[in-house]
Amino acid sequence: MRLSMVPAIVLALALPAVANDVVFEKQFLTERFMAEGCAVADFDRDGHVDVVAGNTIWHGPDFTRLTEYTPPRDNPAGPAKTPYDPARGYSNYFLMFAHDFDGDGWHDILVYDLPGEPALLFVNPRGEAKPWSKHAIFARADGESPGLIDITGDGVPELFCQSSGPELGGRLGFAVLDKASPSGEATFRPITPRTPENDKKYFRYTHGSGAGDVNGDGRVDIVTKDGWFEQPDSLDDGGLWPFHPVDFVPGGGMGGAQMLVFDVDGDGRSDVVTSYNAHGYGLGWFRQESDGSFTEHRILGKRPEDNPEGVCFTQLHALAAADFDGDGLTDFVTGKRRWAHGMKGDPEPNAAPVLYWFRLVRGGDGGVAFEPQLIDDDSGVGTQVTVADVNADGKPDIVVANKRGVFIFRQKPAG
């Protein structure tokens, strides 16, 4: 384990994002390509939250002290050849999650490696200055938009993702960690059948998935670009989940990123917010009607004129929800994933890597709008964007790790 200090904090005022005096201050933690996902937790239990991206923890409250909780990867070849190349390659840290998995009071780190690789658990050594123990807990974690959420309702989060292989085929489901021994092998519980169609649909690079209570029965359901899977009354038999087809990607797109489930219009029914193509264009929300069907409401399209504010950008590869302006309504954040497929691989790969939050506004007539608020035009998102209160002021902040570097966007006090 190595400790080091950042010579100076690099602070810049992000481009004004003013809605009810919401303005963000940008802190550059590093310009190195470390990861495309990150997590936030108080790893050292000093009362201040920390940021982890790649193999490094930046310690709060000023994030100038660094700890390597595990040695850097040494990959002589492959898509994640080291040092990680932002223009041509990827990293071994696609997404990252923090949770006290072993119940000892110290947050651990779950690393979702490249899709199709093992999911890794790094166990916190309870403040000791030594490398964290590393455990491969799930042999093949597929999909590009997994999540960590308590699906079973037992208070312990599961990793919802996909998995594939000769024996399993392509299946959607969730990996359950062993409560008695979280560092042991997790058990995958598929919710879809094995079919030739699913073998092609659910594989390492499948895009677009999320989790939330779609039908209001108090149980967590799973959504994909093709519809949603209803959690049954009981999970005891390990059976398949009923599927409700919905085209959440109009026009047959490849699918987006994290799909958000919350009540947009205030009618008491859960709606869905999603990007349409993680490597192209499109963003929208889908209103759930009283009969359970969904109606599309486009937010962004392929042209600036598709949005009232003229906003248009590509590669919306990460979304996260939060009430940024404190009005009691759920907003969300997304942006452009810089060089998702390199410098020439996707539409407009070299356009400004923007980061936006979308303010939810409800009208008295029942109308709804998501107003885009530009936070920054030199960062964007990775395959994950993390929302957390990094300075304990009660306001949601934003943390990003991607091919541009690692950033914190901290809300400034009003006025």
Locations of the language-model features?
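Beta-propeller-forming repeat regions
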Residues: 18-415
